[in-house]
Amino acid sequence: MCETGPAVNPVPIGGTPQCRMTPYEEETPLPYAPEQDHDRAFLEQAIAQSRRSLDPGTKKPFGAVVVVGGEVVGVGSNRVVEACDPTAHAEVVALRDAGRRLGTFLLEGGTLYSSCEPCPMCLTACYWAGISRLVYAADRHDAARNGHPDLQFYRELALPNRERRLLDEVNVEGEVRSAAVEVLAAWAAAQPGPVEPKL
């Protein structure tokens, strides 16, 4: 059964709530961050999170932690099945947890530690969050050998759009596209300074 409940208004340091989170995204108390051999120690914490998800009927075995300034600020285990949320991968849950704790969606200078190489969605989430460093243990081939499709997704995304087979991608031209572009342009025009094209 999917978990439901009212959204939570987290209050960031210094003031006003910025993000709305749902209860299932709140993780357990943060573990102690050791001072020596950070990468290995933080990876072990990520793997410990993955062990929380060993029930094959309700979980998928992945875990992650986010570290900023040498401290763990976000933890996550895979919650896709229990939350009925296809985006609730361990890395995304950890990023959400970090954002809630810090009161910001930008985690610049942070490191994400994952028990396994992130899927394309989670890798992109790291980009959006401004994560500076990604450290993982098992890789996409290890995941594939144990029944997880990450490698297939990476191969699919490497193909030109017209050659992809996992879903149909349709870019509609004409008036509909123009209407959508107008919204993008209106947002850019409303920004306080010039918007730099990301081409």
Predicted regions span which residues?
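Short beta->alpha transition motifs characteristic of CBS
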Residues: 74-80
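Local cysteine-cluster metal-coordination motifs and their immediate loop/turn environment
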Residues: 115-132
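Zinc-dependent deaminase
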Residues: 2, 9-55, 127-199
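Immediate flanking context of iron-sulfur cluster ligation sites
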Residues: 104-117
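Short, flexible loop/turn motifs enriched in small residues
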Residues: 57-61
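A short, polar/charged loop-to-alpha-helix boundary motif
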Residues: 80-93, 97
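Short beta-strand scaffold segments in enzyme catalytic cores
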Residues: 62-67
